[in-house]
Amino acid sequence: MSEIQTASSPVTASSAATDELLVSVVIPALNEAESIEACVRRSIETMENHGIRGEVIVADNGSDDGTPDLARAAGARVIYEQRKGYGSAYLAGFASARGKYIVMGDADETYDFREIARFIEPLEDGADFVMGSRLRGKIHPGAMPWLHRYVGNPVLTGVLNLFFRTGVSDAHCGMRAFRRDLLPRLDLRTTGMEFASEQVIRSSKLGLDIREIPIEYHPRTGESKLSSFSDGWRHLRFLLVHSPTWLFLVPGIGMVLLGVVIGAISLFNVPLFGRQWQLHTLIAGSMLAIVGAQVAQLGVSARTYAFYYLGEHDPLFDRLRARLRLEHGLIAGALVFLTGLVMAGVVLGIWINRGFGELREEKLAIAGLALVVIGIQIIFGAFFLSILGLRRRSRALEDPQPPAAG
């Protein structure tokens, strides 16, 4: 099964002095001999024209067409990254950057590096992260396939905004700029195309000041290395696995509620759409509620893991976590379990009194057994969450607070 590839260690800011350099332009490249010189020269000329002290770094990702030599001849500092991937090249380039600000853009001439100064202005004004927006700017004819322009980018950007409340208009624009000293906090690790999504997500979760500027998007020089569906899926997959709320909690709670409604309609013989819903409807509702409870529990576990091990916060979850303890989960699970057990016990008692004859209380039995299963899930889920919380308690023991001075 395909997995999201990540770097073994986070990229950190270069320890080189930054007093003399304001900007590092980082350009990843893989066989971009036709366009790399123009990108490097435009970057250098733009910085010279605006009095910006900076450098251009080309992160070569295994080119065999002379791209590194052409970039070096044009005035760039070339570094080599053997690990394949869009993110790998950028991580290597970021680690070598020495400027106060990092401007990033592709090597295929789709982005105009003469716009560098426009990205620096918001950073000097206090922004942390500046993104270009092709959709609010100008997309030249032939620059972006209609599938990307009207389906892929809007859908993925919408999903990202829904999950992480970023409020950006073009989440996958490749021309961006940010403060280099934020690299340790961003903790960027993905090595593939989903790197673009990770950068936006991490910036949003950290509460950084994200701003957008409209830019122009030009037809690329050379052959495109994008794969519409596989790269789109990589981005969507990354968004899902980094949002337990939308991946687990929302569908899980939705399934529980729908299952309860369906089950209640059948259990209490509520007429709907002109008919009575029988036993099979209750079975379907019970199964839906059980599966939903399990999925929602996975979401709570993922949220707990993200808090203790990744340092991620969610206002609502943090309030619930602060108020609820293991005992609350055990009590809730026990109540659900005992309710189901009583229902099943009543059915068993009736069946015994009938001499184990015909059982006409199947609906009550199924509902009771469903509650028993859900109660067990809640009980053991509460124990699992408590185990995840051991990390907090162990840290408190390892690093006790010094006694107050008396």
Model-derived features: where do they sit?
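Hydrophobic helical membrane-anchoring modules
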Residues: M1-D19, R165, T190-G406
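Cell-envelope/extracellular polymer assembly enzymes that use nucleotide-activated donors
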Residues: L22-S24, E55, E198
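A conserved hydrophobic helix/loop-capping motif in glycosyltransferases and polysaccharide synthases
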Residues: V23-E32, C39, A59, G375
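Short beta-strand/loop segment that forms part of the nucleotide-sugar
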Residues: V40, I44, H50-G62, G375
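A conserved acidic beta->alpha catalytic loop
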Residues: D60-P68, E109
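Acceptor/aglycone-binding surface of glycosyltransferases and processive sugar-polymer synthases
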Residues: E81-S96, Y101, T110-M193, P219-L236, ...
